[in-house]
C-alpha cells in the first residue's frame, strides 16, 4: 500500500505572474509527487470554479490562499492514510468532500493540485514514468501538436479577433521532427514580421501578436512562413484556429471588431467556411458561442466532415455536457483542459467518452501555465493523438514539448507519430 502521510499546499506564480496552487504529496515510502495547476484567460461559463481570495489589496484579488488552506486542512484530513494508487477512490473522496456541482467550495484548483500530485507520487512509487502509469503498456503514441504561432483575442493586445492561429505538422515520421518543423516555421515567421517592421513581441502562449489588417492576411503570412521554412502548406503543415467565439459574441451577433463585421450564426458559419476553403485549415476550435447550440449544429453540418470542430467553452471537459453534444451531433472533437473539471478521473472519463463516440480529444494547456508538464504524459498515456500547448517560445510552453521528446526517447522503436491519422473524426 502506498499510504499518503503528508500533504503540503502552497501558493506559487504562473506564467502571467498570477498566483496558482502547487501541492506536494508524500507517501509512506518517502516518495513524493508535486503538481501545479494552470489558469485560463478565456473561460467557459460552466467550468469548475477556480477559488480566488478576492482580496483587492493582495495580487489584485487573485490570491489562492483559501484554496491552499483547504489543501492543508480539510483535504489533508480526508485523504491522509489513503492508498495513492487508488486514484478513482481518492478523486471520489475529493468530490464528496467538496459537495458542490462545480467544485466551488474547495476550489477546482485545490482539488486538481492534489489529484495530480497523488498520481505523480503513485507513479514514482511504482517505478513507472507518469505516461506509463496512466496508460499501461498501450501508451505509445505521441500527439500531433497544434502550435499557436500567432495570438489574438483575449491572449494578445492587437487587432485580431480570432484568439489563436496554429500550425499543425503532419507529414513527419516522428514527434521530434514535427517539433523541429514547428520551430523552423516559427523562426521563419519571426523573420517575415521583422522584415515588415511588425511586432515580434509574444502573447500569453508564446505566439507573435502583431497587428494584421485581417484574419485572412494573418493566415496568408503564415503560409509564407511555412514555405520560407522549406515546407509545403497543406501537405507537411496544416493550419488550425481557435476562434474563442464566446469572447466576441454580443447581442446575438459575432462581432469581429478588427474587421468591422457583425455576423449572425449563419453568416459566421459562411465566414469560417470561406476561410476553410481558401486555407488548409484542419481544425477550428470554439467556432460558435458556447450557448449557441443552433449555430454549432449549423457549423457541424456545414464543415464537420472536412474540418475538426473542437468544443472547448462548449464542453468544458464535462462528460454530462459532452454526452448531450454527442447525442445532438454537435462538434466532432473535445478540448481537454484538466482544470476545467478538477480531477484526473473526470478528465480521463471525458477522453474515453469522446473516443467511444468517434470524437477526437485534444489535450490542452491554459494561457496561464507553469513548468508542470503533466499534460504531456496524459496525451501519451491516454493515446489522445493531439496536444495544444502553445508556441515555440516561453519555457512554460516548451516544458511540455521537451517532456514529449523525453517520452519519445523512452519509448524507443515502439513510439509512433500519427500525423494526419490523428484526425480520425474526419471522413
Curated annotation (Swiss-Prot):
EC number in record: 4.2.1.11
Keyword Cytoplasm: yes
Enzyme type, top EC level: lyase
Biological process (GO), any one: glycolytic process
Residues involved in Mg(2+) binding: 242, 285, 312
Metabolic or biological pathway: Carbohydrate degradation; glycolysis; pyruvate from D-glyceraldehyde 3-phosphate: step 4/5
A molecular function (GO) term: phosphopyruvate hydratase activity
Cofactor entry: Mg(2+)
SUPFAM superfamilies per UniProt: Enolase C-terminal domain-like, Enolase N-terminal domain-like
Cofactor: record remark: Binds a second Mg(2+) ion via substrate during catalysis.
Keyword vocabulary terms for this entry: Cytoplasm, Glycolysis, Lyase, Magnesium, Metal-binding, Secreted
Pfam families: Enolase_C (PF00113), Enolase_N (PF03952)
Subcellular location: Cytoplasm; Secreted; Cell surface
Catalytic activity: (2R)-2-phosphoglycerate = phosphoenolpyruvate + H2O
Record's keyword annotation contains Lyase: yes
UniProt binding sites for (2R)-2-phosphoglycerate: 163, 337, 366-367, 388
Cellular compartments per GO CC: cell surface; extracellular region; phosphopyruvate hydratase complex
Positions of disulphide bridges: none
InterPro entries assigned to the protein according to its UniProt record, in alphabetical order: Enolase, Enolase-like_C_sf, Enolase-like_N, Enolase_C, Enolase_CS, Enolase_N
Described purpose of this protein according to its UniProt entry: Catalyzes the reversible conversion of 2-phosphoglycerate (2-PG) into phosphoenolpyruvate (PEP). It is essential for the degradation of carbohydrates via glycolysis.
Database matches in HAMAP family: Enolase
Family: Belongs to the enolase family.
Name of the protein: Enolase
Organism: Burkholderia vietnamiensis (strain G4 / LMG 22486) (Burkholderia cepacia (strain R1808))
Amino acid at each position: 500500500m502506498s499510504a499518503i502521510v503528508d500533504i503540503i499546499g502552497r501558493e506559487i506564480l504562473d506564467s502571467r505572474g498570477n498566483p496558482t496552487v502547487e501541492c506536494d504529496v508524500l507517501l509512506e515510502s518517502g516518495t513524493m509527487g508535486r503538481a501545479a495547476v494552470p489558469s485560463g484567460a478565456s473561460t467557459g461559463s460552466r467550468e469548475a470554479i477556480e477559488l480566488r481570495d478576492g482580496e483587492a489589496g493582495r495580487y489584485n484579488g487573485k490570491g489562492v490562499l483559501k484554496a491552499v488552506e483547504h489543501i492543508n486542512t480539510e483535504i489533508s484530513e480526508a485523504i491522509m492514510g489513503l492508498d495513492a494508487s487508488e486514484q478513482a477512490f481518492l478523486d471520489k473522496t475529493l468530490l464528496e468532500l467538496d459537495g458542490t456541482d462545480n467544485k466551488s467550495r474547495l476550489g477546482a484548483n485545490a482539488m486538481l493540485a492534489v489529484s495530480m500530485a497523488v498520481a505523480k507520487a503513485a507513479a514514482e512509487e511504482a517505478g513507472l514514468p507518469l505516461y506509463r502509469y496512466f496508460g499501461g503498456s498501450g501508451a505509445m503514441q505521441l500527439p500531433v501538436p497544434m502550435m499557436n504561432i500567432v495570438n489574438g483575442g483575449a491572449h494578445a493586445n492587437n487587432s485580431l479577433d480570432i484568439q489563436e492561429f496554429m500550425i499543425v505538422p503532419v507529414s513527419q515520421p516522428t514527434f521530434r521532427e514535427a517539433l523541429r518543423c514547428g520551430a523552423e516555421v516559427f523562426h521563419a515567421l519571426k523573420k517575415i514580421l521583422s522584415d515588415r517592421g511588425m511586432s515580434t513581441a509574444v502573447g500569453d502562449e508564446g505566439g507573435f501578436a502583431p497587428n494584421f489588417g485581417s484574419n485572412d492576411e494573418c493566415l496568408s503570412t503564415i503560409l509564407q512562413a511555412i514555405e520560407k521554412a522549406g515546407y509545403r502548406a497543406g501537405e507537411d503543415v496544416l493550419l488550425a484556429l481557435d476562434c474563442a467565439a464566446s469572447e466576441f459574441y454580443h447581442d446575438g451577433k459575432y462581432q469581429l471588431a478588427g474587421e468591422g463585421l457583425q455576423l449572425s450564426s449563419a453568416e459566421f458559419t459562411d465566414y469560417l467556411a470561406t476561410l476553410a476553403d481558401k486555407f488548409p485549415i484542419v481544425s477550428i476550435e470554439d467556432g460558435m458561442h458556447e450557448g449557441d447550440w443552433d449555430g454549432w449544429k449549423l457549423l457541424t453540418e456545414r464543415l464537420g466532415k472536412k474540418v475538426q470542430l473542437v468544443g472547448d467553452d462548449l464542453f468544458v471537459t464535462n462528460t454530462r455536457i459532452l454526452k448531450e453534444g454527442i447525442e445532438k451531433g454537435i462538434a466532432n472533437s473535445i478540448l481537454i483542459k484538466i482544470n476545467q473539471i478538477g480531477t484526473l478521473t473526470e478528465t480521463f472519463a471525458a477522453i474515453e467518452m469522446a473516443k467511444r463516440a468517434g470524437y477526437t480529444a485534444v489535450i490542452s494547456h491554459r494561457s496561464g501555465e507553469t513548468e508542470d508538464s503533466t499534460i504531456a504524459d496524459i496525451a501519451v498515456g491516454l493515446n489522445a493523438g493531439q496536444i495544444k500547448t502553445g508556441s515555440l517560445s516561453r519555457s512554460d510552453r516548451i516544458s511540455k514539448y521537451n517532456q514529449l521528446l523525453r517520452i519519445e526517447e523512452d519509448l524507443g522503436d515502439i513510439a509512433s507519430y500519427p500525423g494526419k491519422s490523428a484526425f480520425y473524426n474526419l471522413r
